[in-house]
């Protein structure tokens, strides 16, 4: 009965009711472990939580591009957001904002649309805008530091430890069901036990994953997160995994417990695809008070692990100065824009280079085989040749040609373009990405109206194109208060 009720809440998208009943199941499960039906309800509750689609949290935002020269910085963004892994797409998202009223500084958001998958970034940004008031900073880096200090304090004030921990549990369970045990369970149902013949395969998979993760350094933000504290915090998740493994005779204590705990711990505290799966990208662009040229800086904000928020800078060359007169900075879905910049897609380029390496390897092996009957020593020498340096040299040469013939001429042209021209270029790069998605047999994850903002030293933050969710003619008071 409880399980049916949970599924009904899940199907209707009733998150609040789902959470309430799930937590009740977890409490019952903690008190009555010997009751098999209660354990199933406990298990189902957490799995449903891990797979449930929450339109406020699981929103992924897509294409943004920034173009800079000595006159201005222009940033364009589409309006598409993808919900629940691509099951639903809306074309109404705002991704570009003025960070500080009256100051030439903007901010753009891509990736996860919510801080720690809890609070929409738009809410955080607009609260920061009130917080900063009329304060100004000498450099853009100082604006960025002040904003992220505010974000850290914001998470402590507005995101409870319980909510943050629920997000971590949900993500871990989702990763377990989709990436680890997919194809190893008795059925496609994520609640089903691990099939008995698949238990050795699962153990081998976990052992190899653990070995890879041990090579990764524990990130500095999580140095004080001990394995013991982590395991205690996610004990409900481990109970679910234990039940799945033990149902068909898996030896939890003897074989699986240590390796599962170690894998989940290291997945959460190292830099890997799991920890990057819910990342928000934040780009801050414009001018500090003492700067005459614009810049654009990106940071990645990760979900919290036991109360610790990780914010990581992305190395860039998007600061305009006397030696760097222009820059194009694609963010999120970069493939179409990078093809425009380089004249060839990275996918095609890498495929071509891989095919060349395969052809060289085959030629070496064929030459060795032909030589062997006549001169075995020479054949061995040929087969033992290290031709990786040839491939590396070839790769460097290809990249050099692309830069000389494609990238440099484009950047040199952008150096002398006016504000309106770089704004038009930014808009068209987003439009090209949208059109590419439109004519391919995949979800249209880039689309909708394109917003374009220009920031110059003299004029400050200017909207060239901006959508509204309301009619400006009917809401004059809104614009009056903005003044």
For each feature predicted by the language model, list its residue ranges.
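Short, positively charged and aromatic/hydrophobic N-terminal segments
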Residues: 9, 27, 46-57
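Short hydrophobic alpha-helical segments enriched in small aliphatic residues
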Residues: 11, 22, 32, 43-45, ...
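Intrinsically disordered, glycine-rich low-complexity segments
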Residues: 12-15, 28-37
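Compositionally biased, low-complexity segments
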Residues: 37-40, 46
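N-terminal nucleophile
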Residues: 56-483
């Amino acid at each position: 009965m409880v399980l049916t009720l949970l599924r009904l809440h899940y199907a209707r998208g009733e998150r609040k009711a789902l959470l309430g009943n799930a937590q009740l199941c977890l409490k019952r499960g903690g008190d009555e472990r010997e009751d098999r039906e209660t354990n199933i309800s406990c298990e189902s509750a957490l799995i449903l939580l891990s797979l449930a689609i929450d339109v406020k949290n699981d929103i992924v935002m897509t294409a943004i591009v920034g173009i800079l020269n000595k006159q201005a910085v222009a940033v364009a963004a589409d309006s598409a957001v993808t919900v629940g892994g691509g099951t639903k797409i809306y074309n109404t998202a705002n991704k570009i904002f003025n960070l500080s009223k009256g100051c030439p500084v903007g901010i753009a958001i891509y990736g996860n649309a919510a801080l720690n998958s809890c609070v929409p970034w738009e809410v955080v940004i607009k609260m920061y805008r009130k917080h900063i008031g009329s304060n100004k900073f000498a450099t853009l880096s100082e604006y960025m530091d002040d904003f992220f200090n505010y974000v850290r304090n914001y998470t402590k004030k507005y995101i409870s430890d319980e909510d943050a921990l629920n997000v971590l549990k949900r993500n871990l369970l989702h990763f377990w069901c989709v990436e680890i045990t997919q194809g190893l369970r008795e059925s496609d149902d994520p609640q089903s036990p691990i099939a008995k013949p698949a238990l050795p395969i699962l153990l081998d998979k976990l052992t190899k994953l653990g070995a890879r993760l041990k090579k990764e350094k524990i990130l500095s933000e999580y140095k004080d997160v001990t394995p013991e504290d982590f395991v205690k915090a996610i004990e409900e998740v481990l109970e679910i995994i234990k039940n799945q493994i033990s149902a068909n005779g898996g030896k939890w204590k003897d074989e699986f417990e240590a390796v599962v705990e170690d894998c989940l711990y290291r997945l959460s505290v190292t830099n890997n695809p799991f920890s990057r799966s819910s990342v928000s990208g934040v780009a801050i662009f414009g001018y500090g008070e003492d700067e005459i040229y614009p810049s654009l800086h990106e940071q990645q904000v990760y979900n919290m692990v036991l109360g610790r928020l990780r914010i990581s800078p992305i190395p860039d060359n998007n600061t305009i100065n006397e030696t760097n007169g222009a820059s194009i900075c694609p963010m999120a879905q970069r493939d179409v824009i990078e093809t425009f910049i380089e004249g060839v897609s990275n996918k095609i380029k890498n495929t071509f280079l891989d095919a060349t390496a395969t052809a060289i390897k085959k030629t070496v092996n064929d030459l060795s085989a032909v030589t062997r009957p006549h001169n075995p020593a020479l054949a061995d020498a040929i087969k033992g040749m290290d031709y990786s340096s040839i491939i590396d040299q070839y790769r460097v040469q290809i990249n050099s040609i692309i830069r000389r013939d494609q990238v440099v001429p484009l950047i040199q042209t952008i150096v002398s373009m006016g504000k309106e021209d770089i704004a038009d270029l930014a808009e068209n790069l987003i439009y090209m990405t949208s059109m590419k998605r439109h004519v391919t047999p995949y979800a249209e994850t880039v689309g909708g109206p394109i917003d374009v903002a220009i920031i110059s030293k003299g004029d400050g933050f200017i909207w060239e194109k901006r959508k509204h969710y309301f009619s400006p003619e009917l809401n004059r008071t809104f614009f009056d208060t903005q003044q």
